[in-house]
């Protein structure tokens, strides 16, 4: 009985750990998002070759976030990070209209991956501070998000440098993951 009560208490009040994979095309702002969430500040970044992994605490959830480089030549390595992923944060450069089709193709391939079939999908429509940025509604259309079935998804307009929208996205993700367990 003591073990049952302990597990119940932990589930109700304790920290829950979630494995999150953050991906997107190169230059979308993934690393800036990660360190804005982790440190609360903008750091100077260089293109990620490989990955960064950090734990981000939000409310009573401890997100282990894997930020994986987005260059074309290393995207084939992403599949090595899929196992046990509970949520995907797909970061899109809202200002890069020339690559939104490429982002859609990459995302659609990932949606077809069996190991990600139960993952919640959060799309960060990043760089909303730029004057020519596509709105979240426009990105929803261009990525074909309305065609996603049998899994939760959400799009959040963000600006990684100011932090705008990041915690709203984490709020949705934490609620989505809580509801799926």
From Swiss-Prot:
This is ADP-ribosylation factor 1. GTP-binding protein involved in Golgi vesicle trafficking. May modulate vesicle budding and uncoating within the Golgi apparatus. May recruit the lipid transfer protein VPS13 to Golgi membranes. Recruits polyadenylate-binding protein PAB1 to COPI vesicles, and this is required for correct localization of the asymmetrically distributed ASH1 mRNA. The keyword Nucleotide-binding applies. Disruption phenotype: Increases phosphatidylserine levels in the outer leaflet of the cell membrane. Simultaneous knockout of DRS2 results in inviability. Gene3D superfamilies: P-loop containing nucleotide triphosphate hydrolases (3.40.50.300). It comes from the Eukaryota. The lineage of its organism: Eukaryota, Fungi, Dikarya, Ascomycota, Saccharomycotina. It catalyses: GTP + H2O = GDP + phosphate + H(+). PANTHER family: ADP RIBOSYLATION FACTOR-RELATED. The keyword Secreted does not apply. Its main location: Golgi. One of its GO terms (biological process) is vesicle-mediated transport. Present with 19300 molecules/cell in log phase SD medium. GO terms for molecular function: GTP binding; GTPase activity. PROSITE patterns: ARF (PS51417). One of its GO terms (cellular component) is organelle membrane contact site. Pfam families: Arf. Keywords: ER-Golgi transport, Golgi apparatus, GTP-binding, Hydrolase, Isopeptide bond, Lipoprotein, Myristate, Nucleotide-binding, Protein transport, Transport, Ubl conjugation. Interacts with RUD3. Interacts with VPS13 (via C-terminal part); the interaction is direct. SMART domains: ARF, RAB, SAR. InterPro entries: Arf1-5-like, P-loop_NTPase, Small_GTP-bd, Small_GTPase_ARF, Small_GTPase_ARF/SAR. GTP binds at residues 25-32, 48, 70, 126-129, 160-161. Belongs to the small GTPase superfamily. Arf family. It is found in: Golgi apparatus.
């Amino acid at each position: 009985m003591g073990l049952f009560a302990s597990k119940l208490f932990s589930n109700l009040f304790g920290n829950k750990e979630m494995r999150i994979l953050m991906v997107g095309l190169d230059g979308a702002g993934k690393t800036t998002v990660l360190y804005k969430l982790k440190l609360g500040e903008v750091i100077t970044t260089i293109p990620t070759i490989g990955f960064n992994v950090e734990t981000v605490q939000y409310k009573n959830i401890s997100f282990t976030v894997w930020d994986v480089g987005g260059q074309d030549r290393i995207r084939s390595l992403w599949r090595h990070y899929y196992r046990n992923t509970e949520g995907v944060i797909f970061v899109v450069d809202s200002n890069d209209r020339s690559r939104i089709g490429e982002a859609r193709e990459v995302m659609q391939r990932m949606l077809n991956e069996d190991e990600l079939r139960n993952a919640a999908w959060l799309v960060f429509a990043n760089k909303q501070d730029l004057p020519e940025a596509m709105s979240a509604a426009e990105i929803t259309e261009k990525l074909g998000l309305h065609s996603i079935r049998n899994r939760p998804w959400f799009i959040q307009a963000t600006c990684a440098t100011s932090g705008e929208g990041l915690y709203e996205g984490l709020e949705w993700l934490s609620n989505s993951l809580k509801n799926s367990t």
